[in-house]
Each structure stands twice: as structure tokens, then as C-alpha cells.
Amino acid sequence: MINLIPMTVRGAEKLRRELKKLKSINRPRIIAAIAEAREHGDLKENAEYHSAREEQSFCEGRIKEIELKLSNSQIIDVTKISNNGRVIFGSTVSILNIKNNEKFTYRIVGDDESDFKKNLISINSPIARGLIGKEINDVVIICTPGGDVEYKILKINYI
């Protein structure tokens, strides 16, 4: 049985855009570069040829990777699922660090979509695991490498 990878609608759209670009722009450009490099003669010492072949290998590998992810993904539209006012996959959560009054806003996404610098956290991260299923005004304790941290849930958005 295949384990489906949870992915937001935005995450799937981003992968589809990348796949389209790789297939319609990058792949033809690389093929043209290989053909041009072949015209220069001896392929053994042709750096342009080897560089283009390496780029082709990377491009084709990424195409296969994206196609596999999309075929094994469960695309979840957070706006269309019941949440009962609780934190769920795909929701955007504003939390307050009770100790230092620092506020954070995170969106809970799939592993491949996560980007901490953009406040996109993986469903499998300690913060997300601690928040899932909780409601506004709940206090959660998140185990971090620096010790346990208490957060209060201020706001939950489903966008």
C-alpha cells in the first residue's frame, strides 16, 4: 500500500508550475545545448557537452521526482474540510510564546512545502504536532532542543 503524501493545494500548484517549466523550457534548451556541443567535435574533452549532459541528468531527475510526488500526494484543500475551530493540516496559526510574549504565525504544510523562513512548517515538525487538534486560547507545550516552551493559540485561519 502506498502512503500518500499530504500536500496543500498551493504546494501542488507550485510543483505543477515547476514541472511545466522543466518540460517546456529547460528540457528543450538543454537538448539544443547538447546538439550544439556535439557539433564542436570530440566529445571526450568537450566541457560544454559534459556540462549540458549533467544538466540534462539533473533536469530529468527532478521531473521524475515531481511526477512521483504528485502521483503519490493527497491534495488537501483546507477551505473544504471540516475543522470545528481546531488547528488542522493547512491552517495558519498565530501563537504567543507565554514566557517572552513573542508572537509567531505559521502555516502547517506537507514536508516538501515546508520553509521555516517563510513560516511554512511541516506537519511532522514538533510545533505542528503540538498544535494539531487544538483550539483558540488553548495553551500547548512544545518540546524544543532548548527545553519545553509554552504557547497560547491566538488565531486560526483556514485559507
Swiss-Prot record:
**Xref: PANTHER family:** TRANSCRIPTION ELONGATION FACTOR GREA
Q: Where are the transmembrane segments?
A: none
- What this protein is called in its record is Transcription elongation factor GreA
Question: Which family is it part of?
Answer: Belongs to the GreA/GreB family.
Keyword tags: DNA-binding, Transcription, Transcription regulation
Q: Which GO terms describe its biological process?
A: DNA-templated transcription elongation; regulation of DNA-templated transcription elongation
Report the domain of life of the source organism.
Answer: Bacteria
> Its biological function?
Necessary for efficient RNA polymerase transcription elongation past template-encoded arresting sites. The arresting sites in DNA have the property of trapping a certain fraction of elongating RNA polymerases that pass through, resulting in locked ternary complexes. Cleavage of the nascent transcript by cleavage factors such as GreA or GreB allows the resumption of elongation from the new 3'terminus. GreA releases sequences of 2 to 3 nucleotides.
